[in-house]
Amino acid sequence: MAELGKEVVDLFNQPGRIGTLATADKHGQPNAAYFGSLRPMADGSITVGLTNNRTLRNLQENALAVFFIVKEGPVTFQTPGYRLYLKVRGIHREGPVLAEIKGFISQHAGPEAASAIAAGVVFDVTEVRPLVAMG
């Protein structure tokens, strides 16, 4: 598992940051969606709560994803940001992981948003790359 440095964690925790999670189904059909709820955990993993949506369906078929995270928009070649390459460790439809994620979402987005969450996903970070890498 790749290590998340302090700069990456700080960017996750910055209000107004922008994040896009890219997934693909078992046939390679891509999907990208804006997410504000991904967050780093103490063990270096990343968690997110998902509704029954295309992202969740894709992750059930293909465990690989990329999270694109930037400080702010508009994005330029100088905008601070990273690409985090992820692999699903687990998809939790019940139990303490889902409960913790729903609690976090309830606290930050309200109980209605939390009640829509169908699964909590835990990712291992396999690689961290800068937003812009020539080569």
Residue ranges and their predicted role:
Residues 1-135:
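Binding-site signature for planar aromatic cofactors or substrates
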